[in-house]
Amino acid sequence: MNDHARHSQHPLADAPVRLTPREQQVLLWCAYGKSSWEIGQILACKESTVNFHVSNILRKFDVPTRVAAVIKAIRYGMLAEQ
């Protein structure tokens, strides 16, 4: 198997960004267009906690917005249709 095929079979292993499980949840809800308040209601946490996770996600992806983080996550194969 060539390197390209191996990499495309395991995109998460090759993704340059490592998110915590909670950051992954927050990112998924961001992809669905939810606000920090809405995500807080869904995950049973405070809006400020969601904003903390969003800040970490933006820093890890080195992007300025949630939309840019979602786009990068899709490119890296980190978000799939549920």
Language model segments and positions:
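Linker/hinge segments immediately adjacent to helix-turn-helix/homeobox DNA-binding domains
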Residues: 1-22, 28-29, 37-44, 77-82
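Intrinsic structural disorder/low-complexity segments
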Residues: 7-10, 56, 72
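Alpha-helical structural signal
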Residues: 23, 54, 67-70, 75
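Hydrophobic residues on short alpha-helical segments
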Residues: 27-31, 58, 70
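Short amphipathic helical patch at the helix-1/turn junction of helix-turn-helix
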Residues: 29-31, 48, 74
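Recognition helix of helix-turn-helix DNA-binding domains
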Residues: 35-68
